[in-house]
UniProtKB/Swiss-Prot annotation:
GO cellular component: cell outer membrane
Cellular compartment(s): Cell outer membrane
The gene coding this protein: omp
Lineage of producing organism: Bacteria, Pseudomonadati, Pseudomonadota, Alphaproteobacteria, Rickettsiales
Record keyword Nucleus present: no
Signal peptide: 1-19
Protein's recorded name: 17 kDa surface antigen
InterPro entries: Anti_2 (IPR032635), Gly_zipper_2TM_dom (IPR008816), Surface_antigen_Rickettsia (IPR016364)
Primary location recorded for the protein, binned into one broad class: membrane
Covalent lipid adducts (N-palmitoyl cysteine), residues: 20
Organism: Rickettsia felis (strain ATCC VR-1525 / URRWXCal2)
Matching Pfam families: 17kDa_Anti_2, Rick_17kDa_Anti
């Protein structure tokens, strides 16, 4: 399960970094494919044991990548900006279990971030587990991750 958690964290980090990329960076469909693949792998890992579980991870990753790519293709720069601002606000000041929503009035895309458990890591930083859900073109995608508060006050996805 640790491997799958790392996959999800890497995918979320790539998604958040995508918001900072210029024209030469990964496109929104690539980001969606990465997120979907990681989410599918996590879901697939819940089925079977041993080799059967590995097959579940592979199939889940493939199906998630296809769906995630389609959803990612529908996210624009404003969607990513709104998602990132909402993530920062939710992680900083929202009680565990309470969702904070974002909505792009121009295209109807929306999502929400739900911070969960708060803890301190081995270096003393405050960290939070969270769930992030986006609905793009009527299709929902959900991801799980951990983020830690940096000295500058911003939250950063960690692995």
């Amino acid at each position: 399960m640790k491997l799958l958690s790392k996959i999800m964290i890497i995918a979320l980090a790539a998604s958040m970094l995508q918001a900072c990329n210029g024209p030469g960076g990964m496109n929104k469909q690539g980001t969606g494919t990465l997120l979907g693949g990681a989410g599918g792998a996590l879901l697939g890992s819940q089925f079977g044991k041993g080799k059967g579980q590995l097959v579940g991870v592979g199939v889940g990753a493939l199906l998630g990548a296809v769906l995630g790519g389609q959803i990612g293709a529908g996210m624009d720069e404003q969607d990513r900006r709104l998602a990132e601002l909402t993530s920062q606000r939710a992680l900083e000041a929202t009680p565990s279990g309470t969702s904070v929503e974002w909505r792009n009035p121009d295209n109807g895309n929306h999502g929400y971030v739900t911070p969960n458990k708060t803890y301190r890591n081995s270096t003393g930083q405050y960290c939070r587990e969270y769930t992030q859900t986006v609905v793009i073109g009527g299709k929902q995608q959900k991801a799980y991750g951990n983020a830690c508060r940096q000295p500058d006050g911003l939250w950063q996805v960690v692995n």
